[in-house]
Each structure stands twice: as C-alpha cells, then as structure tokens.
Swiss-Prot record:
It comes from the Archaea. InterPro entries: QueC, Rossmann-like_a/b/a_fold. Gene3D superfamilies: HUPs. Its EC number is 6.3.4.20. ATP binds at A11, S12, G13, G14, M15, D16, S17, A18, T19, A20, A21. This is 7-cyano-7-deazaguanine synthase. Its cofactor is Zn(2+). PANTHER family: 7-CYANO-7-DEAZAGUANINE SYNTHASE. GO terms for molecular function: ATP binding; ligase activity, forming carbon-nitrogen bonds; zinc ion binding. Belongs to the QueC family. Zn(2+) binds at C192, C200, C203, C206.
Amino acid sequence: MTDDTRAVVLASGGMDSATAAYEAQTRGYDHLYLLHTSYGQNTEDREYECASALADHVDAADFLHVETGHLTQIGASSLTDDSMEVADADTDSDEIPTSYVPFRNANLLSMAVSYAEANDCGAVFIGAHSEDFSGYPDCRPAFFDAFQGVIDAGTKPDTDIALVAPFVEWSKTDIAERGVELGVPYADTWSCYRDDEPACGTCDACAFRLEAFQRIGERDPIEYAERPTYAE
C-alpha cells in the first residue's frame, strides 16, 4: 500500500536535486529515500560525497548508492567517454551538448520507481528544470508525462507513484532562490562536469549555477578555479 509520506529523490549531488529533496519535505514527504547513481562520470566521487551529505541533512530514511557502469560502456557523452572533451559553456546554445548521456533519465527513473515500489513510496522526485530540457531531450515535460504512463502501466495495481518534477518549468535562478528560502546547504552540492575540487567555473554546469547565484545576489559557497560573471 502506497504511503504518501514517503518519496524517493534522485540525488545527483547537485543543487537541483538537493533543492528537490527540501521541496519534497515542504510538501509533506517526511520520509525520504535518496537514490544516487555512479555511472563513470568525471566527478563521481565528489558527487557521491555531496549526495551522502544531503542524506544526512534531510535525515533520510534510506540512502541507496547504485553503480550503473553500463552507461559508461555505452559512452557517447563527454561525462563518461575519455575521448570526448567537456565543452566550455555556451548558455545560449540550443544544440544537444556533449554532456548529454543517452537516455540517462529513463535508466535512473526506472531504478527510482523500483526503489519506490519496494518501499511503498508515493512519489519519485527529480530536479530537472527548463534550462535542462533546452538541451537534454529526457528532461522535457513530455518525457516525464510519458514516463508517468509507464509507471502507471508497469507497477502493481495497488501502487500509486507520482513522478514529480517540481522545477520543470523553472529556471536555475528560480531554483537557487527557492533553495536559499528553504535553507538548502549549497556548500555541500556539486555541479561541475570537469573537476572534483575546485569547480572549473567554465563548463555549462558551472556557468548555469554561477549565473543563478549572481542573478539572486548571492555568492555561490563552493570554490571555483575561475569565477566569471555570467549574469548581465
């Protein structure tokens, strides 16, 4: 029987998923089950540390770390393939970036739904936002709507799991503003695609993050090798 106080949160170690966890708590999900995956990404050790820290911050009911090495074997992403370079930031581009991991969210959500069903959770939270789906096809609202249909068709009759993407129509700036309001510990989050410490400051992930903090007038608490001004 589904328990509407329990939710799985896909915890990447980044600021979006951390904010999603705190948002879930404000919506009455008092028992959070955090799922973190390592798939050979360049900064997987740092991301794991941050996801583990988030589990402590929210007093998670459980923290599950899963190795998904098949995404490294598949390759075709600069996050997992050493033959591909992580490109410098181009926040105005509408092209699919080299950091796109083919159909990653379908893989991660499938595991999250299994985890949710096994623990009678009423929801799965993912921190995708509007600036993600401009470049990543599996972050689009239509994808999440379709995946909700997969959940409904493929789980037990007495299972009722909602796929919640609370920020799918929000910008990164909106998320940063909400997170500051909720007291999200952004010092314990990581976004950089290139480096474990300090963050590079020049990849897409760093650029969107820095721009968000600059737009709300807050200093990003993590260290950067470079800290360019992205907000005009």
